[in-house]
């Protein structure tokens, strides 16, 4: 798989953007993509030193134009991406990631939770297209590389979801 392969898209009128928006700026599906890609990368690569759930098959099923977390996308790119994805397959991916994460968490020892991960594991995320070299994306490697596995459970695995979830719920209930 290759990393981010975005193309510039023409700006949609504001009312068209809002149709796809999870807030006044970001589509709901992007919020889910972003949080679950991060959960997939952190749980599988950093916490378990295993393989991420996301692969070429998921890329095709979801019909995503990117493999990374989407941090470096401009709003126009996010809107264009959101129009093309298969939402049902994104939901299936989210469920697969969540089930897998629960298995990983159930097997962690206290010693592992207190430990840091090797730099090689962190760099795998870039090598496998989970982040791009854009500064808005690559900073995640520095951030995650400074956390213990316990810190990863608290930050990218828990509070990160809670940061994005209210925006999505507000739009659904709104």
Residues covered by each model-derived region:
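A generic structural signal for well-ordered alpha-helical segments enriched in polar/charged residues
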Residues: 3, 7, 41, 96-103, ...
């Amino acid at each position: 798989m290759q990393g981010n392969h975005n193309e510039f898209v023409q700006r949609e009128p504001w009312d068209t953007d809002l149709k796809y928006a999870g807030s006044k700026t970001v589509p709901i599906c992007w919020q889910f993509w972003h949080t679950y890609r991060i959960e997939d990368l952190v749980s599988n690569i950093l916490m378990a030193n295993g393989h991420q759930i996301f692969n070429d098959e998921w890329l095709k099923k979801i019909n995503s134009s990117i493999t990374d977390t989407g941090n470096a996308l401009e709003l126009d790119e996010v809107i264009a991406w959101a129009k093309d994805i298969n939402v049902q397959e994104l939901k299936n991916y989210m469920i697969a990631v969540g089930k897998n994460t629960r298995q990983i968490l159930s097997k962690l020892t206290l010693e592992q939770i207190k430990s840091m991960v090797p730099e090689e594991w962190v760099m795998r995320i870039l090598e496998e297209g989970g982040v791009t070299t854009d500064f808005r994306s690559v900073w995640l490697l520095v951030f995650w590389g400074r956390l213990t596995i316990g810190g990863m459970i608290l930050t990218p695995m828990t509070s990160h979801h809670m940061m994005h979830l209210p925006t999505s719920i507000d739009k659904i209930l709104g």
